[in-house]
Amino acid sequence: IFGKPRLAFLVSSGAMDSMVSNYTANNKPRSEDAYAHGGEKGHRPDRALTTYVGAIRQAYKGTNIIIGGIEASLRRFSHYDYWSNTVKRSILLDSKADLLIYGMGERAIIEIANQLKDGKSAREIRNVRGTCWYTGKESDINALQNSTDTTEDYRVKPDNDTFDKKQFIHLPSFEEVKNDSPESKEKYALSYLIQEQNTDAINADILIEKTDSRFVVQNPPAMPLSTEEMDKIYSLPFTRKWHPMYDKPAANGKSGIPALSEVKFSLTSCRGCFGACSFCAITFHQGRRIQARSHTSLVEEATKMTKDKDFKGYIHDVGGPTANFRNDACENQKINGACKNKDCLGVNPCKNVKVSHTDYVELLQKLRNIPNVKKVFIRSGIRFDYLMMDKDKTFFTELCKHHISGQLKVAPEHVNDNVLRLMRKSTHKVYEQFSDEYERINKELGKKQFLVPYYIAGHPGADLSAAVDVALYLKKTGFVPDQVQDFYPTPGSLATCMYWTELNPRKKNADGTFEKVYVAKGGHERRLQRALLQFNKRENMNLVKEALKLCGRENVFKILYK
């Protein structure tokens, strides 16, 4: 199908890690793939990125191959692989690609293309932000660390546009982190901590990881895009259509790409997330800095949507990783980058967080006033703790009045405060305050609208007793979810590190070791926790009995089933 490219093959496995796409949280094959033709499963191979690169290498020996996207970005260093229950090497080495782009990649790909055009091979490109490269020569690493000219390729001080010397941090080697031993897991946790501390373009250092006789080097992340650059990217002539080859029915009789329906009439207003939930890898991919589009850009895109023959008057979403983040968390982030050892939100929100929904309110008002727009929904998730920190309740009222259709989906995730701490979520009390305020505002507006909370079963830190706490709260509120999300240890998240190591790299004990974390690893205990969160299902009653007996809380059975 392809000829040999002029510059390089650019390879991605899609908008989701191929193993996540192909398998459920309980490691069972999925019955469908929303990103494939007709929603059929089986169109994308397991470990797709490695498979694709191997096929290209076989067909076009000596061609530049550059990998990017979610699968590449979140597997850029040694990482725990849930599906094989092992620690795997950097995907840059396993795939045998020449260069890896991590993060969103627009800045990096332009610089790389220019260097390729000037005659460099991909293996020779080592000075581009947002990339990982490798070498088998220790002399290359020594030269890099001793060089004086690397400074002009790295840290940019945004206040005066001068350059600053970078540090070089050697991560624990693959050999040190790969084993299932306490010592190896301590090293793994340390490696993850260092990686997480170096995801900000301003203050990140250069990371080096040794694997056998080779070294993987991560250059600092790309600088955040300006509003003007974001606008330029999203003004490109995207068709909002699948390729015509998918118009014909697949073997299951269905045509098209199902996943498109959710995003076809949605607007991406921002990138990045300073919420940094432990179970989410967006921070590892996009960083904590918020990059937002202008109102003009979003209104123009929405206006174009209204001309689409399939548009029914409804904009499905206006958001990003977190819908109500439109600005950096604080002024310090713009100057010094996101703090390495402090969270913006969570159980103890930083006092420097600058809370405002004014810009988002104005944007939503403009979108509502576009001719032929009947309703503007918000579906990509509201960070309710941030919302509750805002003393101005204008957005909360506008949200209930204009942007919900009967129910609002939110993610408290748990009720046990220790589990919430490990999740980096707010305390349960904050959710209850939010729930009360939501009810009050809707009553004031004369609307009957409901909250649909999402909960995770089996997250690191959650034992059976913690799951019982959730069950009791659900009984008290009269809401039991139809769907419960089982914790899924996917590459790149803090929670996955906790799952593998049973350690919390974000907290140290007095002796310098990392805090120990309880982890439900057996499939049966995960089923027990899930059953507790759905105790109302008749088929779960025996599992609930078993769970209550195991954690010594048999008395709860009468409360749940009275």
Model-derived features: positions:
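Conserved SAM/AdoMet-binding glycine-rich loop
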Residues: 18, 304-452, 456-460
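Glycine-rich beta-alpha loop elements in corrinoid/cobalamin-binding modules
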Residues: 1-211, 218, 518
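N-terminal [4Fe-4S]-dependent radical SAM core
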Residues: 186-266
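Conserved, mostly hydrophobic/aromatic
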Residues: 98, 233, 277, 298, ...
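Catalytic cores of alpha/beta
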Residues: 395, 459-475
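Iron-sulfur (Fe-S) cluster-binding segments and ferredoxin-like electron-carrier domains
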Residues: 280-297
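N-terminal pre-triad scaffold of radical SAM enzymes
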Residues: 249-281, 299, 314
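Terminal amphipathic helices with adjacent charged low-complexity linkers/tails
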Residues: 123-148, 161-199, 213, 222-225, ...
